[in-house]
Amino acid sequence: MGFNIERADKPFVVKSPYKPSGDQPQAIAELAERIENGENDVVLMGATGTGKTATTAWLIEKLQRPTLIIEPNKTLAAQLCAEFRELMPDNAVSYFVSYYDYYQPEAYIPQTDTYIEKDSNINDDVERLRHQATANLLTRRDCVVVATVSCIYGLGTPEEYAGRMLFLKVGQEINRDDLLRQFVAMQYKRNDIAFTRGTFRVRGDTVEIIPVYEELAVRIEFFGDEIDRISTLHPLTGDEIDEENEVHIFPASHYVAGPERMERALKTIREELEERLAELRKQGKELEAQRLNMRTTYDLEMLTQVGVCSGVENYSRHFDGRAAGTPPHTLLDFFPDDFLLVIDESHVTVPQIGAMYEGDASRKRTLVEHGFRLPSAMDNRPLKWPEFLQRVGQTVYLSATPGDYEMGLSDGVVEQIIRPTGLLDPKIDVRPVKGQIDDLLAEIKARVAKNERALVTTLTKKMAEDLTDYLLERGIKVEYLHSDVDTLRRVELLRMLREGKIDVIVGINLLREGLDLPEVSLVAILDADKEGFLRSYRSLIQTIGRAARNVSGTVIMYADETTEAMRQAIDETDRRRAKQIAYNQEHGIDPKPLIKKISDVNDMLAKEDVDTQTLLEGGYRNAGKAGNTHLGVPVLDPNEADKRHEEILKAGLPAQDLADLIRQLSEQMHTAAEQLQFELAARLRDEIRDLKKELRQMTEANK
């Protein structure tokens, strides 16, 4: 789609110390060949731990096409985005997920006459990353966007968003006041005191703005009515970072509407209101008509006076100028026509994309019927499955267990089952249910003796709790993982398992996709012959995969009979294992254990604290705040702290301010981590590192 913006055409380049190995080269070549030959749907069936992420990156490098990757949840999306940023540091890797930390949609329950107002909490950093994704898509071709199902929900029109974009160049003739009016029309706010994202400030002939998708501010210096200089600067310190010749500034909102659009929207909303009121009164729904009239009239007044109202997205059809029933504009419309779609964990993600529309529609239908919303609110919705398919081109489905839908579309799958480390799929042992607990206890003890770990999956919470108690009584270090355990506690338990503080985790359905634990050598599946969702072929394959990252990985299924799902899972695992053994023998490869660093956010905080206090006070007293006292280093000479303080004083006021700023940001970093805002914590860490580098240079210069 062209928006009169020339996209920078930089090549995709993967920077990795590794080369494609195992059957990665064959998978990359086959996928690329099929896509270049015009196949629309291709399935990559990649066993756990075979490097599907790296294969995808190398495929993008080979095809040189902008790519959208859809993940089933925010956690996996964040994980994949971080991996892609490491693999493609010079390309635009963006993150596009729902920006709500908390979201309670507007709803009405007729049975109890209960109206629930919309309530939400927006995460500013995720919102910035969403804006960064759309800005990148319109200005560059080397884009990879990692998204969740959020990408099929309504977004403003790309034409209007690009049309309101401002292009500024050194030497350009533009009146300063006209520029300020344009910023306001783009929904930026003037604030000469608190300079934050989405605001601008004016100081004589100098205008500074922080675009919503950037962390750096842009300074525009005028000489009369001509732009004399453009530069980027650090918004906190005011230090200039780079001089620019030209800059694009996109609107502060995806839902930006010019005066003509606003005028037209207000007119069509009034017309729809009149029609709907007549309809409701004809049906004898006087209460509903009165309610609708009152709510919509208030919204119209707000739109006229302020340009925005609560729930403005429900009028998106009027602002976009769409006909009733037509699909909304989404992130997909921001991509060039030749983009590639990758659906990760497709057995989960495909049904998820298909299910979004109906859930949204049933809630809105009730609101419309009872006079809380105009019928046009139904058109502020996610895409239906057929509409989604119309907007995407060639698609790669990634999964260890592809679903029936994608298997039916594709003409044979591309397999990737050889691991670069030579690791094999685990051996599977089926044992009788009688005496299963004592047998399991003996197996766990054997693993503990070898400093290995075990996962046990049961069918019910009750059984998981009872088994955990039984193992605890027998002296096993065990924890129980279930749906009530919050995210941070879950991460902590898995970390404790890897460190050996616990030897066994008992769970129900939480031991499947995306769990990467190289220390686990035993996965025990209790009641494997009870047919159902938790013991289906795909669930079993995903659970078996948790033991595939250890050289001596074994799976024990406790069952009295072999179900069809079990037989399929065992046959598939044996087939893969035979192929892996043959490959290893042919190439003389010995399976190597997967070495994966145990790291978490607490480590990151503690290390940063060590460095900060060593810099500011010449020593490090207590790492307790970060929860890792073992990372503390002894305080140096008692006079060292005074000496360091004197050095900072000698370097002058900027150095003192910098030291104070580092302390403040360190506190903010801890707060962000405590509130699970890990992206913000990591960003603050990077900022602290830059400031510390600057402070070191200042103190060195004054020695």
Curated annotation (Swiss-Prot):
Domain Helicase C-terminal: 436-589
Protein name per UniProt: UvrABC system protein B
Functional description taken from the UniProt entry: The UvrABC repair system catalyzes the recognition and processing of DNA lesions. A damage recognition complex composed of 2 UvrA and 2 UvrB subunits scans DNA for abnormalities. Upon binding of the UvrA(2)B(2) complex to a putative damaged site, the DNA wraps around one UvrB monomer. DNA wrap is dependent on ATP binding by UvrB and probably causes local melting of the DNA helix, facilitating insertion of UvrB beta-hairpin between the DNA strands. Then UvrB probes one DNA strand for the presence of a lesion.
Family under the similarity heading: Belongs to the UvrB family.
Binding-site positions, ATP: G46, A47, T48, G49, T50, G51, K52, T53
Protein's cellular compartments: Cytoplasm
CDD domains xref list: DEXHc_UvrB, SF2_C_UvrB
PANTHER family found in the cross-reference section: UVRABC SYSTEM PROTEIN B
GO cellular component terms attached to this protein's record: cytoplasm; excinuclease repair complex
Domain Helicase ATP-binding: 33-419
Domain of life the protein comes from: Bacteria
One Gene Ontology biological process: nucleotide-excision repair
Subunit structure, interactors included: Forms a heterotetramer with UvrA during the search for lesions. Interacts with UvrC in an incision complex.
Domain notes: The beta-hairpin motif is involved in DNA binding.
Span of domain UVR: 659-694
GO MF term set: ATP binding; ATP hydrolysis activity; DNA binding; excinuclease ABC activity
Keyword set, alphabetical order: ATP-binding, Cytoplasm, DNA damage, DNA excision, DNA repair, Excision nuclease, Nucleotide-binding, SOS response
Motif Beta-hairpin location, chain numbering: 99-122
